[in-house]
């Protein structure tokens, strides 16, 4: 990076890749560039450190700890009780994330993450409730564009059963009173972690213990979620991000005209697609609302369900009414069947 800085003018440095967040921040500090600080980048990557900072700011989040031995892990389990979540310190999405219900399951998950040989992992309280996310483009620590989406069902539940047709739904009701607490808490998280001008992606839970923050990333969300926001709000979010980073302002105004969503229909098993049931019926009914889709050809190899929401067959829909959008996605999941051989 020093050679690059000497060879040519570098004005900004950004990344959408979670694993490069700290590297990019270190490079910015080395080159004297504006952007997310190395301290904030580390807090966004190190989940236990992030949650400790949030707890110190009295922001509700799961009890958690960094552990690097089976003894420390079991001590946390005895103190906190089950179920627990065990995952990498700086993981990506739900990759290598385990929900464990007993000491035996905890030991197996610890083996998978290398805790038994001294590798660090994050262990935390399992938070019961509905799961969603709050995304922003923020400037000087204040969200200038904000969006709210929901998972149906939770990410870990969707991974537990391939018969589930998992959905992501981006609401056009962001300004409603029912979301006020989430918006205020999201803004407090951004300020607490020192996130200045950046895209952010914050996951949350709402359940018997109220609203709790899961984690936040200083980057756009994955799964091409921004495409949902662009369609639903009649704006170019990618251009707005560039304007925020380069000019320190955002002129785009979200219309909130449409709710948008993505539903994935998984094959009945691994193998090769042999055909579809009710595909014609589905395509006919959703024609007015579908704006993107992927229907793998007969004979194509299936993709592991762990690969995310845009694997195998999927559909992206838009509708003026959020509830109607969700019902359409539910109907697709109930109706379409993907057969394999």
Annotate each language-model stretch with its function.
Residues 56, 242-341:
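Peripheral (often C-terminal) accessory segments that flank ATP-dependent C-N-forming ligase machineries
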Residues 34, 90-93, 222:
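A short, flexible beta-alpha/helix-coil linker loop
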Residues 64, 86, 123, 145-148, ...:
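Generic preference for hydrophobic
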Residues 1-68, 75, 263, 305-311, ...:
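Conserved N-proximal alpha/beta basic substrate-recognition cap immediately N-terminal to
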Residues 81, 206-212, 306-311:
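A short, glycine/Asx- and small/polar-enriched loop/turn
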Residues 11, 119, 191:
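Short acidic/polar active-site loop segments enriched in Thr and Asp
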Residues 104, 125-195, 199, 206, ...:
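ATP-dependent carboxylate/phosphate-activation module, predominantly the ATP-grasp catalytic core
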Residues 43-122, 127-128, 139-141, 170-184, ...:
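Active-site nucleotide/adenylate-binding loops and adjacent lid/helix of ATP-dependent enzymes
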């Amino acid at each position: 990076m020093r050679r690059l800085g000497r060879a040519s003018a570098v004005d900004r440095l950004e990344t959408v890749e979670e694993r490069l967040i700290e590297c990019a921040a270190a490079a910015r500090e080395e080159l004297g560039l504006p952007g997310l600080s190395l301290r904030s980048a580390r807090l966004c990557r190190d989940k236990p450190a992030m949650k400790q900072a949030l707890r110190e700011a009295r922001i509700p989040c799961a009890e958690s700890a960094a552990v690097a031995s089976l003894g420390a892990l079991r001590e946390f389990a005895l103190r906190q009780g089950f179920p627990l979540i065990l995952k990498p310190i700086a993981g990506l999405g739900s990759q290598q994330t385990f929900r464990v219900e007993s000491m035996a399951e905890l030991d197996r998950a610890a083996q998978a993450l290398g805790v038994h040989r001294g590798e660090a992992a994050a262990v935390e309280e399992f938070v019961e409730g509905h799961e969603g996310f709050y995304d922003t483009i923020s400037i000087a620590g204040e969200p200038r564009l904000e969006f709210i989406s929901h998972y149906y069902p939770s990410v870990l539940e969707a991974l537990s059963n391939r018969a589930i047709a998992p959905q992501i739904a981006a609401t056009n009701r962001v300004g409603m009173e029912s979301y006020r607490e989430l918006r205020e808490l999201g803004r407090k998280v951004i300020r607490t972690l020192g996130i200045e001008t950046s895209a952010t992606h914050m996951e949350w839970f709402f359940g018997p213990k109220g609203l709790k923050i899961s984690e936040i990333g200083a980057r756009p969300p994955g799964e091409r979620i921004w495409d949902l926001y662009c369609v639903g709000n009649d704006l170019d979010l990618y251009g707005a991000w560039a304007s925020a980073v380069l000019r320190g302002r955002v002129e785009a105004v979200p219309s909130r005209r449409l709710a948008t969503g993505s539903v994935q229909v998984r094959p009945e098993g691994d193998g090769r697609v042999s055909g579809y049931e009710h595909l014609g019926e589905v395509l006919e009914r959703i024609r007015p609302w579908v704006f993107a889709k992927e229907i793998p050809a007969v004979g194509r190899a299936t993709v592991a369900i762990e690969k995310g929401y845009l694997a195998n067959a999927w559909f992206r829909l838009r509708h003026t009414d959020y509830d109607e959008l969700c019902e359409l996605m539910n109907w697709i999941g109930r109706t379409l069947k993907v057969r394999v051989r």
